[in-house]
């Protein structure tokens, strides 16, 4: 089976003084989360589309699903965890408890605040994850990346044409992801920045799918302005 895991667990601290977590803020008069969910509903391959949100926001999430006529029976809402990877594991726990997990099950995980992903990106994630077990969505780095260990001095400058910027979706064979996560030490889990690092640490290959420049993550007030401009300018592909 194929599952979508929409990660809506953040509280949006970088968005500044706003009344709601960033995933519930509007772009073009509709919550960011709803824009994102609508992209996944269009993909018939998904057996379930699972939204993980902070426990205290589950009721609000269910309310906006009703308000915007999200009636697809595949859409479920569960409580997220304390961090990104714990949230993904909560989604997997839901799958295990309700459906069981088969050897070939795939999960497509995606940031709720990336509303401009395309059908191509989603479908390529499904295909590559089913074939190879793990895939990340990336774009080539445009700017030179510098590394600083002390935030004051440059310690290295990687070769730019070997650098990519990670986006989402990040998609996995569920058993591979679960087993790899369980094998990590507590110290390793504390420094994880995304789910693909779980697979990299296990020694398993992670394939790449081409993202899009406009597949932005809406995390700051500036991003919110850019997101509205993308919609109003009809820049993103469907």
From Swiss-Prot:
BP-aspect Gene Ontology terms: cell wall organization; isoprenoid biosynthetic process; poly(ribitol phosphate) teichoic acid biosynthetic process
Alphabetical UniProt keywords: Cell wall biogenesis/degradation, Nucleotidyltransferase, Teichoic acid biosynthesis, Transferase
Matching Gene3D superfamilies: Spore Coat Polysaccharide Biosynthesis Protein SpsA, Chain A
InterPro entries per UniProt: IspD/TarI (IPR034683), IspD/TarI_cytidylyltransf_bact (IPR050088), ISPD_synthase_CS (IPR018294), Nucleotide-diphossugar_trans (IPR029044), TarI (IPR034709)
Entries under SUPFAM superfamilies matching the protein: Nucleotide-diphospho-sugar transferases
Marked site: Transition state stabilizer: 14, 22
Pfam families in the record: IspD
Catalytic reaction equation(s): D-ribitol 5-phosphate + CTP + H(+) = CDP-L-ribitol + diphosphate
Pathway where it operates: Cell wall biogenesis; poly(ribitol phosphate) teichoic acid biosynthesis
Binding site for CTP: 7-10, 81-87
Example GO molecular function: 2-C-methyl-D-erythritol 4-phosphate cytidylyltransferase activity
Site (Positions ribitol 5-phosphate for the nucleophilic attack): 160, 217
EC number: 2.7.7.40
UniProt keyword Electron transport present: no
UniProt xrefs under HAMAP family: TarI (MF_02068)
Function: Catalyzes the transfer of the cytidylyl group of CTP to D-ribitol 5-phosphate.
Homology family: Belongs to the IspD/TarI cytidylyltransferase family. TarI subfamily.
The name this protein goes by in its record: Ribitol-5-phosphate cytidylyltransferase 2
Source organism of this protein record: Staphylococcus aureus (strain MRSA252)
Name of encoding gene: tarI2
């Amino acid at each position: 089976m194929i599952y979508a895991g929409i990660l809506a667990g953040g509280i949006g601290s970088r968005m500044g003084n706003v009344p709601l977590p960033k995933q519930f803020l509007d772009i073009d008069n509709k919550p960011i989360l709803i824009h994102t969910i609508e992209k996944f509903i269009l993909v018939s391959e998904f057996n379930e589309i699972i939204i993980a949100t902070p426990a205290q926001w589950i009721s609000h999430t269910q309310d906006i699903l009703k308000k915007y006529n999200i009636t697809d029976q595949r859409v479920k809402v569960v409580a997220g965890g304390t961090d990104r990877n714990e949230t993904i594991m909560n989604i997997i726990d839901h799958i295990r408890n309700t459906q069981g997990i088969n050897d070939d099950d795939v999960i497509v995980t995606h940031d709720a605040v990336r509303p401009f992903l395309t059908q191509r990106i989603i479908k390529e994630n499904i295909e590559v994850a089913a074939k190879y077990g793990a895939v990340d969505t990336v774009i080539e780095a445009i700017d030179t990346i510098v590394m600083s260990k002390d935030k004051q001095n440059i310690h290295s400058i990687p070769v730019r044409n070997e650098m990519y910027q990670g986006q989402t979706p990040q998609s996995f064979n569920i058993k591979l992801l679960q087993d790899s996560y369980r094998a990590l030490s507590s110290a390793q889990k504390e420094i994880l920045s995304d789910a693909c690092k779980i697979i990299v640490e296990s020694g398993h290959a992670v394939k790449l799918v081409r993202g899009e420049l406009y597949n932005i993550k809406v995390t700051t007030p500036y991003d919110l302005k850019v997101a509205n401009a993308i919609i109003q300018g009809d820049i993103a592909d469907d």
